[in-house]
Regions:
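Active-site mouth loops of central-metabolism enzymes
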Residues: 1-4, 25, 49-65, 84, ...
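Metal-associated gating/positioning segment near the N- to mid-region
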Residues: 1-45
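Residues at alpha-helix caps and immediate loop-helix transition turns in enzyme cores, especially N-
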Residues: 5, 32-36, 64-65, 92-93, ...
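Structured loop/turn residues at beta-strand edges in well-structured enzyme cores
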Residues: 16, 49, 75
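Short beta-strand segments at enzyme active-site cores
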Residues: 20-24, 54, 108-111, 161
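Glycine-/small-residue-rich active-site loops that bind phosphorylated ligands and cofactors
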Residues: 28-32, 60-61, 85-88, 165
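Alpha-helix-loop-beta-strand connector modules within alpha/beta enzyme cores
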Residues: 34-54, 98-112
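Histidine/acidic residue-rich metal-binding segments in metalloenzymes
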Residues: 66-184
Length: 184
């Protein structure tokens, strides 16, 4: 198996018709500081397609302590996301949304309440039952989105929810947008 690099990732993206791609923060090491983002920007300077790095929202993507958001933004990060990991601490999301407004940046939040999802791997339903795999109840996603939108309504800022899988989740986001919240 070949290790993906910035160069070959850029080449594949370009051949697939993309002119720019987001680079998630789940690199090795996790891109959670100014040096990591500067390195990514330097290595991608001559790439065929534009690379837009995301910085980790928290140190080592552990959802404990906020990373150096302002410094990463100044080094070229376009947003902040602990790749496929929910923000467990509501106050951390609140603080991140408040702080990121001062430098016009976006916070991304993975929509899953882990205490409900546990070790599920697909949405709970007929397919999970027929394959005999642990399902994730829909409300695991919807509870997290609802919490995040309430916090966004309180703080303002920009919130991106990178994946949704239920109609109710979509309806929650539509309702928030109709209230003027900056959510995508």
């Amino acid at each position: 198996e070949e290790r993906e690099t910035i160069e070959n990732g850029s080449n594949v993206a370009s051949k697939s018709g993309f002119t720019g791609i987001l680079l998630n923060s789940n690199t090795k090491p996790v891109a959670d500081n100014q040096t990591d983002i500067s390195f990514i920007k330097l290595k991608s300077k001559n790439s065929i397609c534009n690379i837009y790095p995301l910085g980790a929202l928290t140190i080592s993507s552990k959802s404990v302590e906020m990373a150096e958001l302002f410094d990463m933004k100044n080094s070229g990060a376009v947003g902040f996301y602990d790749y496929k990991k929910p923000i467990l601490n509501s106050n951390l999301l609140k603080t991140s949304l408040l702080y990121s407004q001062s430098f016009d940046s976006v916070v991304m939040s993975f929509p899953m309440d882990q205490s409900i999802a546990k070790k599920g791997i697909i949405n709970e339903g007929m397919i999970s039952v027929s394959y005999g795999v642990k399902g994730i109840p829909n409300f695991s996603e919807e509870i997290q989105i609802n919490r995040d939108l309430h916090i966004l309504e309180y703080t303002g800022g920009k919130l991106h929810i990178p994946t949704i899988s239920t109609k109710k989740s979509l309806d929650l986001i539509k309702k928030a947008k109709s209230k003027g919240l900056n959510v995508s």
